[in-house]
Amino acid sequence: MGYVRWLGHAAFEISIDGYTVLIDPWLTNPLSPVKVEDYRDKVDLIIVTHDHGDHLGESVELLRINRRARFVAVYELANYVAEQLGGATDRVIGANIGGPVRIPDINLKVMFFPATHSSSRGTPTGVLIVGKETSIYHAGDTGLAAEMALVGELYSPKIALVPIGGHFTMDAYQAAKAIEMLRAKVVIPMHYNTFPVIRADPEELKRYVDEFKLDAKVVVLKPGELYQF
């Protein structure tokens, strides 16, 4: 049995098909229930959606204490991370929006999709992870985007992790529309209440999902809690 564990903000720990995956591991965020050291020698894969500090987080430090872990991001961001580690390494894999990324020793499908946001190193993205146990879409930082409908049409991810804080990303109303396009069955809100400017009530997302009569379950996690699948 796998799980999705919210670590505050947009950071998640995912256990899928026997792998431990971290997405956007800003583990020093104000809501975080964990420390970087908690993950020493425990991580198989780190995925980062874009280069903003609240998403890249402690990726480099985590790679240093997880010598076998792989890192995947868009090409320009991956190059930056490799430089921080001292130069080119096969542990850091640069990819782009498109089909599945080939990751040595990791038997998961990982695909990047466009996100409507900003980024200094490469294109901002959302990411889809497809394993034998389930499929999970992490939307990254994004506004509402038409490409989400294509993700839903092609892959219908079973679990969607969507921002609801507004100001920098979608709010709850737009996130509900994103859920409709993604066709996800389970939705976990993220990227809210870290700072006053992105304060939001996740119950509002539930209300919109009910109002739109969507076939989706909204799972509200407290930092550190997990959803098992």
Swiss-Prot record:
It comes from the Archaea. Disulfide bonds: none annotated. Pfam families: Lactamase_B_2. GO terms for molecular function: hydrolase activity. Keywords: Hydrolase. InterPro entries: Metallo-B-lactamas, RibonucZ/Hydroxyglut_hydro, UPF0173, UPF0173_UPF0282_UlaG_hydrolase. Belongs to the UPF0173 family. This is UPF0173 metal-dependent hydrolase Hbut_0886.
